[in-house]
């Protein structure tokens, strides 16, 4: 007597194989659990009802079911899951019908994004078109000369002076104001550049001629035996001493005659200054004594 497929035993081969299939089916085909569209649920119900009716109709004759072999050995539930998994690989009309809904929700989003980008691009282009640079004001040569002349006289103008100058030159007050600002900035830049040039190229030191008075520990004398080798500025220092030769009077001769030992002494004439005790000295010896003292002082110096 054969057992019907409805009854199960825990030690039969079919039950062991069915347990393995139940473990492998949820892991291998998770798609039936993920899909939750109403078309899919309707398809599962329609697919499961004939299977159930066939199972109940074939429940009386178990031997005929075995010989037929149309029923898979896993049971009705597994057959429904396997058929559902096979149908997943094929394109289904239910999914195609549902896909436009999802696509419809995405397409408007892209359209909105594109339109937003286009709007932003239009807004960003509008300020660029509005920011047009004003044309440059060209001054005539007469206006530039008049402005330069006034700038040399006065670098800063008050509002009334600016208005008066602008009306005289047929310009606006703003144009005159901007011209003076640019001119002041130009002068400042020129001063800075000039200072940098002077700092980069310092002035050469001046050379001053210095006369050589002593060389190798000896005074530098001229070719003459007694004439000192001084340049023209220093020759004036000797000339005052030579003028003492003209003073041959008794008062001066008497006072300076005894100061030098090398001067010859003679009888001094009887003068009031000599009797007063100013010393003895000859009239002719005084100029020679002065010249000798002058030469000795210059040589020692």
Swiss-Prot record:
This is Homeobox protein Nkx-2.6. SUPFAM superfamilies: Homeodomain-like. Keywords: Activator, Developmental protein, Disease variant, DNA-binding, Homeobox, Nucleus, Transcription, Transcription regulation. One of its GO terms (biological process) is positive regulation of cell population proliferation. Coiled coil: none annotated. Belongs to the NK-2 homeobox family. Acts as a transcriptional activator. In conjunction with NKX2-5, may play a role in both pharyngeal and cardiac embryonic development. It comes from the Eukaryota. GO terms for molecular function: DNA-binding transcription activator activity, RNA polymerase II-specific; DNA-binding transcription factor activity; DNA-binding transcription factor activity, RNA polymerase II-specific; RNA polymerase II cis-regulatory region sequence-specific DNA binding. It is linked to Conotruncal heart malformations: A group of congenital heart defects involving the outflow tracts. Examples include truncus arteriosus communis, double-outlet right ventricle and transposition of great arteries. Truncus arteriosus communis is characterized by a single outflow tract instead of a separate aorta and pulmonary artery. In transposition of the great arteries, the aorta arises from the right ventricle and the pulmonary artery from the left ventricle. In double outlet of the right ventricle, both the pulmonary artery and aorta arise from the right ventricle. Residues 132-191 bind DNA. It is found in: Nucleus. One of its GO terms (cellular component) is chromatin. PROSITE patterns: HOMEOBOX_1, HOMEOBOX_2. Pfam families: Homeodomain. Residues 22-135 are annotated as: Disordered.
